[in-house]
């Protein structure tokens, strides 16, 4: 058993999620950011790859105090569990995703340096999945056992590609902002090895100056 896996990502009209520097770019409009905050609040956990942590240093928390209060009234913690897919345990000890605003799980493989793992364990939960790379299916089963029923994935492109190619995504929502980024080395929504995966378009909606496409995959 695994959670319902929902991917949310913002991209340029040419499908890029950042430029060649891989630093965070503002693509979403204010209205879309409010929608993303609501989607976070409705999730049991939020997952990103280590590349996103190193590039953006995200908090991955619910920004709206009203939404955090609603979660608490529903018997939940103010913020969802944060999950980092980090085979080699490269997460900086100063990363904001390790702060005390929410619980954090760092998923590593057996090649992660033991000393670094011990340090990270002082501020977060660390669990091993796989020999050299994190086995995503095992991680999702682990999260389901922890009570995670809805998992929101926010990137980056390598993690999203791995999940979709392994049939581990149920739904994806892509917000397209009115910009072009270009660059053959700029990261895309799905990075990594090529694959073919069909989906069905559920909804296309205008949001601010951009639009969002929601699609589902057969489970």
Curated annotation (Swiss-Prot):
The keyword Chaperone does not apply. One of its GO terms (biological process) is riboflavin biosynthetic process. Coiled coil: none annotated. It comes from the Archaea. Keywords: NADP, Oxidoreductase, Riboflavin biosynthesis. Pathway: Cofactor biosynthesis; riboflavin biosynthesis. GO terms for molecular function: 5-amino-6-(5-phosphoribosylamino)uracil reductase activity; NADP binding. The keyword Mitochondrion does not apply. It catalyses: 2,5-diamino-6-(1-D-ribitylamino)pyrimidin-4(3H)-one 5'-phosphate + NADP(+) = 2,5-diamino-6-(1-D-ribosylamino)pyrimidin-4(3H)-one 5'-phosphate + NADPH + H(+); 2,5-diamino-6-(1-D-ribitylamino)pyrimidin-4(3H)-one 5'-phosphate + NAD(+) = 2,5-diamino-6-(1-D-ribosylamino)pyrimidin-4(3H)-one 5'-phosphate + NADH + H(+). InterPro entries: DHFR-like_dom_sf, Rib_reduct_arc, RibD_C, RibDG_C, Riboflavin_Biosynth_HTPR. Its EC number is 1.1.1.302. NADP(+) binds at residues 52, 56, 87-90, 134, 156-159. Catalyzes an early step in riboflavin biosynthesis, the NADPH-dependent reduction of the ribose side chain of 2,5-diamino-6-ribosylamino-4(3H)-pyrimidinone 5'-phosphate, yielding 2,5-diamino-6-ribitylamino-4(3H)-pyrimidinone 5'-phosphate. Belongs to the HTP reductase family. Homodimer. This is 2,5-diamino-6-ribosylamino-4(3H)-pyrimidinone 5'-phosphate reductase.
